[in-house]
Design a protein with these regions (language model features):
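Bacterial N-terminal signal peptides that target proteins for export
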Residues: 1-9
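Short amphipathic alpha-helix segments
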Residues: 43-62
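C-terminal motif of bacterial Sec signal peptides marking the signal peptidase cleavage site
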Residues: 16-19
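Post-signal peptide N-terminal segment of mature Sec-exported envelope proteins
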Residues: 28-45
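Catalytic nucleophile loop of clan PA
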Residues: 140-145, 299-325
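Bacterial signal peptide processing site
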Residues: 21-23
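Short glycine/threonine-rich beta-strand-turn micro-motifs
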Residues: 58-90, 94
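Serine endopeptidase catalytic core focused on the charge-relay Asp
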Residues: 123-287, 313-314
């Protein structure tokens, strides 16, 4: 269920935590088409052979999997190389299993897929965090002087604006009840001056959490999925923050920016409006001088739970420049709003986010 805060067509996007379980998808290996032909034994005989052969075959270096193929009553073993094939066949012969009851195929290694929603130590930008009943995204790790911290949204605290010592968990308190960090800085929203009558304002939807001493973190690292706007949450590498934009508040129209968040993964779009004053729907909050991003192809760029995602520009390869923090968007997720990094520092103080 989404935590939805409506304001003038935009949404502040956190995610209500109801329950969590392991949602990993099974891995389907890609196999070479090398299959031996031979006699088929009875199902009962094949099952006895498989029970004996599986542990022996999987003990062979280079073995990938063991399977009893129900449609043929044959034993199938996946291996990485021909050397392993010979060893697997020898193991089967020692058990008295005829060669024509055994199939060996070349298989790719099967690896565990780590998701943005899994437990990560050291922590890094883009992964899931949990507080209270809600889920958000860890934006980026940063040092505030000697204080090792991470930055997320102000609305990803127990109360938006002001410090209530919100406790954070990763990925959730049910998976790991260790408090990884505690809210340390979240300026109150101001009234008057440039702030519209009857509303409360800030220039960034950002808060800082101070890490617990026992939690390891990687400054300057953002989790990277397989590609932009493809919906994948599986981490395939990382981006490195090599620079941070301490000066820009108004980004050029058409500037390409990216984010990584726990719900929609790595998304990319272009700045379509810059230094926009935005009313947060369903609240009295106005965020001043924000940037708006859309994907030219209409792709979804943000979803519930992506709140807190870092915003960055790719400079070369996997090296990136940190430019801000995402906090909201429209109901369809095709538009996101972010606070420039310069304004985050104006409100939270000097931060070092580079590796």
């Amino acid at each position: 269920m989404l935590q939805v805060r409506r304001w003038s067509g935009f949404l502040a996007l956190g995610l209500l935590l109801v329950s969590c379980r392991d949602g990993s998808d099974p891995v389907s290996p890609t196999l070479a088409a090398r299959v031996d032909q031979g006699a088929q034994g009875s199902r009962e005989q094949a099952a006895r052979w498989f029970e004996a052969a599986s542990p022996e075959a999987l003990a062979v270096p280079g073995a990938v999997y063991a399977d009893l193929r129900e449609e043929s009553n044959r034993l199938e073993f996946g291996v990485l190389h021909l050397g392993a094939e010979a060893a697997v066949r020898a193991a089967a012969r020692r058990l008295g299993i005829p060669d024509d009851a055994v199939t060996v195929v070349l298989a790719e290694p099967i690896v565990q897929m780590a998701s943005l929603r899994d437990k990560w130590r050291p922590t890094q930008g883009g992964i899931q965090i949990h507080f209270g009943l809600y889920l958000c995204t860890m934006g980026f790790n940063a040092d505030d002087g000697t204080q090792r911290s991470f930055i997320t949204n102000s609305h990803c605290t127990n109360k938006q604006g002001g410090v209530e010592s919100t406790k954070y968990y990763q990925p959730t308190s049910t998976v790991d009840p260790t408090v990884i960090a505690t809210e340390a800085e979240d300026p109150t929203y101001f009234k008057g001056g440039v702030c519209p009558r009857g509303r409360r304002c800030r220039y960034s939807d950002a808060a800082r959490a101070l890490y617990s001493s026992g939690t390891s973190s990687s400054r300057g690292i953002i989790a990277k999925t397989s590609g932009p706007n493809n919906g994948s949450l599986n981490v395939t590498g990382n981006f490195t923050i090599t620079s941070q934009d301490n000066t820009t508040t108004s980004f050029g129209i058409g500037t390409t920016v990216n984010k990584v968040g726990r719900t929609t993964g790595w998304t990319q779009g272009n700045v379509t409006q810059t230094c926009v004053n935005v009313n947060v729907s369903g609240s009295t909050i106005t965020q001043l001088c924000q940037s708006i991003v859309q994907n030219p192809g209409g792709a979804v760029v943000i979803g519930g739970g992506d709140s807190g995602s870092q915003m960055f520009q790719i400079t070369s390869g996997d090296n990136v420049t940190l430019v801000g923090i995402a906090w909201g968007g429209n109901s369809s997720g095709t538009m996101l709003v972010f606070s420039p990094f310069k304004q985050i520092q104006q409100e939270l103080g000097s931060l070092v986010a580079t590796q």
